[in-house]
């Protein structure tokens, strides 16, 4: 929005040209989202406490989690508000990639909100009926995937980028829609599964999204794209603003979510953040790189799949409890140790992922 005002005021003072730079707006989007999160955090937490929107805890989980029962949840609302206001202020709203991201972010946020509300209303951890939850997640993902494909059909925007190979960029055709669907829905659910400990999901999300801010800038800059042998995609540079808005909102939320947490993001936060991260990875054509940098999310999701599959086939469990962070807790690891070690692993994976951009 501010881009429009700056363009109008440019004829009066050339200093307003600074707003045209993605780097400037990215920094401002981060600071704005973080400031909003820090400001509204206490208000949101207080309101959630008044409404008795407290966390429900599984009875078969680690005993250390019982003290978390009643901690305000649905704090993802403050994340969505922070991202929404910041991106509307600093992103160029004429850019369709901005709207694709916002559509998935808030669409998944609504699904997560309903899921959280049902958990609170029923006083259990089941939430929204699974088939309806995945129906709406799939419906939103398919709309986004089809729209993105229609806009970028048979261009660099629908090529598959393979790490380490600069010449291997096949056109995906209609398979683009299927791949985009699985990346968006899969990432959303993986982040949701990771969100089981204080700060465990938000910090890896911040790290991976910060890396994608750099990737988005490079993909939208023809010279940087040529240097890194990645496809140049015209509209993708603006996604850097969306990424830094997510980073800023995440930092603002982390202020209140760090151990011991004053608030949990709930599904309204984890589903929306995961969905946004997935759609950004699709738009900059780095789905495979997301698997590397978001390795913690991948392992968390795989641990659940393997646990369920093993129990159905063999009536035996592989882990003491899934997702895998609970397995380490039941082995005797203190919660902060699990959290920080997963953060460290994510940092290493993000750095490895960024290095692969040059190793082609």
Curated annotation (Swiss-Prot):
Membrane-topology annotation of the record: Multi-pass membrane protein
GO cellular component, one term: plasma membrane
Primary location: membrane
Residues passing through the membrane, by range: 26-46, 73-93, 98-118, 132-152, 168-188, 199-219, 236-256, 263-283, 288-308, 338-358
Enzyme class: transferase
Keyword line: Cell cycle, Cell division, Cell inner membrane, Cell membrane, Cell shape, Cell wall biogenesis/degradation, Magnesium, Membrane, Metal-binding, Peptidoglycan synthesis, Transferase, Transmembrane, Transmembrane helix
UniProt EC number: 2.7.8.13
Pathway field: Cell wall biogenesis; peptidoglycan biosynthesis
Matching PROSITE patterns: MRAY_1, MRAY_2
HAMAP family, per database record: MraY
Its job: Catalyzes the initial step of the lipid cycle reactions in the biosynthesis of the cell wall peptidoglycan: transfers peptidoglycan precursor phospho-MurNAc-pentapeptide from UDP-MurNAc-pentapeptide onto the lipid carrier undecaprenyl phosphate, yielding undecaprenyl-pyrophosphoryl-MurNAc-pentapeptide, known as lipid I.
Protein name: Phospho-N-acetylmuramoyl-pentapeptide-transferase
Organism this protein belongs to: Haemophilus ducreyi (strain 35000HP / ATCC 700724)
Lineage summary: Bacteria, Pseudomonadati, Pseudomonadota, Gammaproteobacteria, Pasteurellales
Protein encoded by which gene: mraY
